Amino acid sequence: SESDIQAQGLYVHTHSNNGQGKCSIISRYPFSGITPNKYGAYIDLGEGIVVLVMNCHGAYFPYGPYQLNGIEYKDFPATDDVDYVVKVNKEARQGMVDKLLEDFHSSTTPFVCLSGDFNEPSWLDWTEGALSAGLAPYVVQWPTTRSLWEGGIKGDAYRTIHPDPVTHPGFTWTPRPSKKDTKDRLDLTLYTLSPNTEVKSCQVIGENTEMSDIVLPNWGPFENVFDHRGLRTEFVFT
């Protein structure tokens, strides 16, 4: 609960995620403001450094990777029509994207970090290379991250550190797949940097060394808790 978090000396901001379930930002440092649509919190790191941290959770259906892999889900059909899949997935998440971009463009600081479970791959992942390697069934410019990129949020931390989706697919979905499930990178850290910042690392946290950069100790008790792997991103201020 928020009170339990605050009892540990931490700060927490929770928002309604455009009415699609609560999201929270937890910080060791105090907040100095909240964005108009509540997606972000300004965090005062001291010494005159203030950053904007935003968090979101994309609508979980339609789920485009299922559609394009022959899996019907939530009344959305399996199909090989990429344009249709892009259209319905954009319609499902564009309301969230618009509010995120409103908050982003209202920022009073150049450093902005947006993290979340987007329930959609990055537009940098389903490439010609990924198609040739058998990691994606089609080439797709997924609309949520593409729209955010066009709106000015041009950094994808994992792809900054690991630009090749073939050698480093970075799958965060899912550590407990069924035989028919897909593997996808749904959990992202997007960003814009101030002049004195850089991305130092971005690592997947999960159940084993095969699928994760950081193995969570004693994963067993969490097997039925986490359906996504985590992501740890480190930014450096120089």
Labelled PLM ranges:
Residues G58, D117-F118:
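Active-site metal-binding loops of divalent metal-dependent hydrolases
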Residues T35-K38, D44, D103-C113, N119-T238:
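Metal-dependent phosphoester-hydrolase catalytic domains
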Residues S1-N37, E47, T144-K154:
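Active-site surface patch of divalent metal-dependent phosphodiester/phosphate bond hydrolases
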Residues S1, K22, A92-L100, V140-T144:
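Stable alpha-helical elements in mature extracytoplasmic
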Residues P77-Q94, L131-A133:
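Surface-exposed cleft-lining segments at the edges of enzyme active sites
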